[in-house]
Amino acid sequence: MAKNLEDFDKIIVLDFGSQYNQLITRRIRDFGIYSELLPHDLSIEKIKEMNPKGIIFSGGPNSVYDDGALKVDPEIFKLGIPILGICYGMQLMSYDLGGKVERAENKEYGRANITVEDPDSALFKGLPTKQYVWMSHGDLVTQAPEGFEVTASSKNCPIAAIANPDKKFYGIQFHAEVRNSEYGLDILKHFAFDVCGAVANWTMADFIDMQVDEIRKEVGDKKVILGLSGGVDSSVTATLLHKAIGDQLTAIFVDHGMLRKDEGDQVMKALNKDLGVNIIRVNAQERFLNKLKGVTDPEQKRKIIGKEFIEVFNEEAKKLKDVDFLAQGTLYTDVIESGTNTAQTIKSHHNVGGLPEDMNFKLIEPLRKLFKDEVRELGEKLGIPHDLVWRQPFPGPGLGIRVLGEVTEDKLKIVRESDAILREEIKKAGLQEKIWQYFTVLPGIRSVGVMGDGRTYDYTIGIRAVTSIDGMTADFAQIPWDVLGHISDRIVNEVDNVNRIVYDVTSKPPSTIEWE
């Protein structure tokens, strides 16, 4: 019998709008403790019902003293539950409990060195008294509330951490959830285990049992359709749904003509033949390309592709009859990149944007609370072949957003062939599981070259390869020069109309992983 959430220790994170907020949830789950990101104005009654071991206030872009600043119900401080405030969360707790918060004369953005004033304080116990952290604030606490001690400081932030051990209230001005804070994970562990007394009793096996039970309760005897791309997200979604409801699921594999080389056939073999998922394959390449003619704006391309997907689903659903649910492989990172109630939109995501208002299906998103690496772990637990689980992340719009500008069949062929060479050589070099994501893009730039005895004026191919844990932040992958050189040689010699290769050495942020 599947367990309920009440059976697990949990720490909830209240969302005040930081783009890092879901990383906090991710880190807590890494410790084996269940965690969810919830609205900042979550009711006291709901908090009591959830009975968390601890509460974390996330960071955010507001100033606590401004009109319209995001707040919490003051009763939250009377629940007897440990609280950790991060950045804005620390300022809010200080402000609400009688401390002072003011605009900083010297703002801190980026790496900073803090000095731990009280090495015996619960959060810093056993850690170095000098450590680098990641700061991102324009305000600071200038007076701690009564009953609090200052436990850390930095050059521009005299009150960088505070503690009230009696009430188990703690605050840090820096972002412990970001990997740039060298002992950030230790600080979060101290809060979760030492302060909150939580027990690590949450596993992916538990998630499977709970999600299967939840899907069965929600779907009942109704039918579900799923848009299948062949990527990790949709493949794991299909397998999880198949485990829960069997043949009530029909996966609609919309081949929009923007897939990677041979991907369509590989999808059919792995999921339909080997795993038994019921799949209908729809060849819609011409339809999609006609809709994309003359379109160059990336947001518009995403919207068109998303809308066309749903229209295909509607048509296929009518053929199937009595379909009530549309499943999607939406992840936590998809949701945050499309903005939440408190976070600014970075770009509309293919899984959560472009849905028509008159959509005839109820939406079911069983992976919505998971990050990419958790999805891979889930896939392995479900018995999906290793090669499929570790397939490179692939956006719903496919190669359509890796061709910058207008999408044509000829341009898709260039990207598809160059991408296949890149993937083949990365695998030969044994780097396929060391690099989080890698692909080629066609920027639409032509340049002069010399091939044979003649002058050429052909396309440039960009190579993008990054290392990451969860897609929230990423660094460019340091592929050995000889491997990059060989990839370049092969692409310019084997792919028509290409005479130049460039390598993207930008991190996320400031760039996103995809170029569009």
UniProtKB/Swiss-Prot annotation:
One annotated GO molecular function: ATP binding
Documented EC number(s): 6.3.5.2
Pathway(s): Purine metabolism; GMP biosynthesis; GMP from XMP (L-Gln route): step 1/1
Quaternary structure (record): Homodimer.
Organism: Lactobacillus acidophilus (strain ATCC 700396 / NCK56 / N2 / NCFM)
SUPFAM superfamilies documented for this protein: Adenine nucleotide alpha hydrolases-like, Class I glutamine amidotransferase-like
Pfam families documented for this protein: GATase, GMP_synt_C, NAD_synthase
This protein's GO CC annotations: cytosol
Keywords: ATP-binding, Glutamine amidotransferase, GMP biosynthesis, Ligase, Nucleotide-binding, Purine biosynthesis
Protein's name in the database: GMP synthase [glutamine-hydrolyzing]
Keyword Nucleotide-binding carried by entry: yes
Domain GMPS ATP-PPase: 202-391
HAMAP family from the UniProt entry: GMP_synthase
PANTHER family: GMP SYNTHASE [GLUTAMINE-HYDROLYZING] (PTHR11922:SF2), GMP SYNTHASE-RELATED (PTHR11922)
Location of the Glutamine amidotransferase type-1 domain: 10-201
Keyword Nucleotide-binding attached: yes
NCBIfam families the UniProt entry points to: guaA_Cterm (TIGR00884), guaA_Nterm (TIGR00888), PRK00074.1 (NF000848)
Residues at which ATP binds: 229-235
Catalytic activity: XMP + L-glutamine + ATP + H2O = GMP + L-glutamate + AMP + diphosphate + 2 H(+)
Functional note: Catalyzes the synthesis of GMP from XMP.
InterPro entries assigned to the protein according to its UniProt record, in alphabetical order: Class_I_gatase-like, GATASE, GMP_synth_C, GMP_synth_GATase, GMP_synthase, GMPS_ATP_PPase_dom, NAD/GMP_synthase, Rossmann-like_a/b/a_fold
UniProt-annotated catalytic positions: 87, 175, 177
